[in-house]
């Protein structure tokens, strides 16, 4: 199922998902440093593998996907399938509502 068919996202629920599943490796605040994964500030509209100061896998750089709701929705289902060779070890979010909630949170927190 595509993002067009996804339930409306709840950013409060998405914040909880981020804190429990993403914050170990990612930050969202402007000027926050990189952790195991890159800082996600300015995520929407950015091409994969282009955050300054972060060492990406060749797979992320070569994929050249532009991050938006639709691409994140598909990526977050199974990151390793979407970008084979990515360094991201997270297995993904199988529930459509979890992905929609996380995307709603990321849209607010990374703008």
UniProtKB/Swiss-Prot annotation:
Gene Ontology cellular component list: mitochondrial intermembrane space
Post-translational modification: Binds 1 heme c group covalently per subunit.
Subcellular location field: Mitochondrion intermembrane space
Protein keywords: Acetylation, Electron transport, Heme, Iron, Metal-binding, Methylation, Mitochondrion, Respiratory chain, Transport
Residue positions, PTM N6,N6,N6-trimethyllysine: 80, 94
Primary localisation category: mitochondrion
Modified-residue entries (N-acetylalanine), positions: 1
Pfam families attached to this UniProt entry: Cytochrom_C
InterPro entries on file: Cyt_c-like_dom, Cyt_c-like_dom_sf, Cyt_c_1A/1B
Ligand binding (heme c): 22, 25-26, 88
Alphabetized GO MF terms: electron transfer activity; heme binding; metal ion binding
Homology family: Belongs to the cytochrome c family.
Function, as annotated: Electron carrier protein. The oxidized form of the cytochrome c heme group can accept an electron from the heme group of the cytochrome c1 subunit of cytochrome reductase. Cytochrome c then transfers this electron to the cytochrome oxidase complex, the final protein carrier in the mitochondrial electron-transport chain.
Protein name per the record: Cytochrome c
């Amino acid at each position: 199922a595509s993002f067009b068919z996804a339930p409306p996202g709840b950013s409060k629920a998405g914040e909880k998902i981020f804190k429990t599943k993403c914050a170990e490796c990612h930050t969202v605040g402007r000027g926050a440093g990189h952790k195991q994964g890159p800082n996600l500030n300015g995520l929407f509209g950015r091409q994969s593998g282009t955050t300054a100061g972060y060492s990406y896998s060749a797979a992320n750089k070569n994929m050249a996907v532009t991050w938006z709701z639709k691409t994140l929705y598909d990526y977050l289902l199974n990151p390793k399938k979407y970008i084979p060779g990515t360094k991201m070890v997270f297995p993904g979010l199988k529930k459509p509502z979890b992905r929609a909630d996380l995307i709603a949170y990321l849209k607010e927190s990374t703008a």
